[in-house]
Amino acid sequence: VKLWVVAALMLAGCSPSAAPGDESATLEQAAIARGVVRNPAATTPIGLYAREGDRLCIAGDRIGMFVDYGDDIGCSGRGTFTRDGEALRIDLGNGCAFEAAFDGDHIRLPGALPATCKRLCTRRASLAGFEVNRLSESGSEAAALRDPKGRQLCG
């Protein structure tokens, strides 16, 4: 009997197990199917996004963003983007190009950006780690966004 138990345990140890990434992918697919979360593949990024004093607009192939910490400390940039699945390839000009994550309702910039992006900021401000949530899917609202100095970012 002991030999049978040992053989059964060894055989069970050889059976394939689900990889951790598989489980999270399955959970995400189930949430999308039930409408709990938005399907990023079926969602256009066009619209207006915000979080505290940060704003981002997407209208057509144009993208603009700003952060405003007050006391003339902030960042402001505008440029173009292309979409590649759940990634937005953003080009704000003069070598400031990077990839941001898009999940259908949120846009998140990487924690490290090219040094050339620093020109978009004053004093110690940075766009690194910039993260915003969707407020509107309206292209016209996005096109109307202006930075704190009155510059139109997506129009």
Where are the regions a protein language model picked out?
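Bacterial signal peptide processing site
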Residues: 14-17
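Sec-dependent bacterial lipoprotein signal peptides
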Residues: 1-12
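Low-complexity, Pro/Thr/Ser/Glu-rich flexible segments characteristic
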Residues: 20-38
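C-terminal partner/receptor-binding element of secreted or periplasmic proteins
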Residues: 116-155
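N-terminal glycine/threonine-rich, aromatic-flanked beta-hairpin/loop signature
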Residues: 51-89, 153
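A composition-driven surface/loop motif
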Residues: 23-24, 28-29, 44-50, 64, ...
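N-terminal helix-cap/turn-to-beta initiation motif at the start of protein domains
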Residues: 32-50, 57-59, 148-153
